[in-house]
Design a protein with these regions (language model features):
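Short beta-strand segments
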Residues: 74-78, 168-170, 193-196, 216, ...
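A non-catalytic alpha/beta surface segment that caps or lines the substrate-entry region
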Residues: 22-70, 74-76, 80
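Active-site metal-coordination/substrate-binding segment of hydrolases
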Residues: 67-164, 169, 189
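Metal-dependent amide/peptide-bond hydrolase catalytic core
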Residues: 235-405
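N-terminal capping segment at the start of a domain
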Residues: 2-28, 129-130, 318, 378-379
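Midchain, well-structured core segments that form catalytic/ion-binding scaffolds
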Residues: 117-120, 126-139, 172-299, 308-310, ...
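Short, conserved micro-motifs enriched in small and acidic residues
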Residues: 28, 135-146, 228-236, 383-390
Length: 405
């Protein structure tokens, strides 16, 4: 079975994670795909395939004769889809021999324009897989799941030599909880790759340092007719706080290695207002500056309006994996070689986000990220192609073979 055929099956299983639940997994529906994958792994010959109570799927293949001394290699992808768009009743559409032009999504009439998505032109002649316009596709990261499963199937069917192979599928990556309960000792790998990136040939080993901040403003309400020199309007103070942040350090004005402050939510009235931010930067020192800047703005406003008017709570989310990958840079070098063996040139760009691999790397399992062949994640314009998924599968097989040498 080819990877895209598995993808078409997996995306029809509803696995959207729930950021509000506070449970692990965040949604019981994630077990539906987990149990399906366990049964599929067992049918392929992965005898120890299992799912734990938190919806983590594990399995392994013992090393083939002569490869017992080779390192244990892990391959990891996540099963959940992002809550940013509906992941229920996904209806994937295949566009065979795609002409490289604008694409109309049939259920809504939405048009994916090449002017907005220039990468589409590079897919000319391939079989493009899109949504029907009503949901996301789920290639993030069910394409990664499908490619790992297909690589495992190929290894077993063809009797390819390999060291110990460890397979892991996680829940809740999209809400930042994918690695939180991952059993690294039970997984059994010396190092691993997540398969959760962009185009075929990408290898990612740098990501943002990340934090979240909640700003609470306490106002003082009096009748507006007699409010002069007395009222403190919390909503106005909130706008003043946000206005003190640099306009050119927002997601919509940054790229590459530029960090940002992202206002995710705001609400309030005269008495109280709240601002929710995420802070991102590849440079840890620059992220610390952003944290300090929030505190400095709060201190200034408290001096202006009174102590306790503005409170800032900051929590770290994840860290740049680069520091943990550098001592194991063979992972990047092997990926580069495997990508070139597949006829592609490696694409190495810092991730403007995070991956399970970043958290796992800091937990002791070095874990760079590989591409899945997907684009436009988290929305109705998400897409991939049959051929790019095939190339990603071949890259995995090349990596397995290189570590068996």
């Amino acid at each position: 079975m080819r990877a895209y055929e598995r993808l078409l099956n997996y995306v029809r299983v509803y696995t959207t994670s729930d950021p509000e639940s506070g449970t692990h997994p965040s949604a019981a529906r994630e077990f539906d795909l987990a149990h399906q994958l366990v049964e599929e792994l067992k049918a392929l010959g992965v005898e120890d395939a299992r799912v734990d109570e938190h919806c983590y799927v594990y399995g392994s293949l013992p090393a083939t004769p002569g490869c017992e001394d080779k390192p244990a290699l892990g391959l990891i992808a996540h099963m959940d889809t992002a809550p940013d768009a509906s992941g229920e009743n996904v209806n994937p559409i295949l566009h065979e021999n795609y002409d490289g032009g604008d694409v109309t999504l049939p259920a809504t009439g939405m048009v994916m324009k090449v002017s907005a998505f220039p990468f589409l032109a590079s897919m000319k002649g391939e079989t493009l897989i899109t949504t029907d316009g009503t949901t996301l596709l789920g290639a993030d990261d069910k394409a990664g799941v499908a490619e790992i499963m297909t690589a495992v199937e190929t290894v077993l069917e063809k009797g390819l030599p390999h060291g110990k192979l460890c397979i892991g599928f996680t829940p809740d990556e999209e809400i930042g909880e994918g690695a939180s309960l991952f059993d690294i000792p039970g997984f059994g790998a010396d190092f691993a790759y997540t398969v959760d990136g962009g185009d075929a040939g990408s290898v990612e080993y740098e990501n943002f340092n990340a934090a979240a901040a909640t700003v609470t403003i306490h106002g003082f309400s009096v009748h507006p007719g007699s409010a002069k020199d007395t009222m403190i309007n919390a909503s106005n103070v909130a706008m003043e706080f946000h206005g003190a942040l640099p306009v050119m350090a927002r997601p919509e004005t940054t790229e590459g290695r530029q960090g940002f402050y992202h206002l995710c939510q705001m609400y309030g009235d005269v008495t109280e207002a709240k601002l929710g931010y995420i802070l991102r930067d590849h440079d840890a020192a620059k992220l610390q500056f952003k944290k300090d800047n929030l505190l400095d703005i709060a201190a200034y406003l408290n001096g202006k309006y009174g102590d306790g008017t503005v409170e800032v709570e900051i929590k770290d989310s994840y860290r740049n994996m680069l520091e943990k990958i550098k001592p194991h840079f063979h992972l990047v070098e092997t990926a580069r070689k495997a990508i070139r063996m597949a006829g592609l040139e490696p694409e190495e760009v810092p991730v403007r986000g995070g991956t399970d691999g970043a958290t796992l790397s800091w937990m002791g399992l070095p874990c760079p990220n590989l591409g899945t062949g997907g684009f436009n994640f988290h929305g109705v314009c998400e897409c991939t192609t049959v051929e790019r998924m095939d190339r990603c599968t071949q890259i995995l097989l090349n990596i397995i073979g290189l570590y068996a040498e």
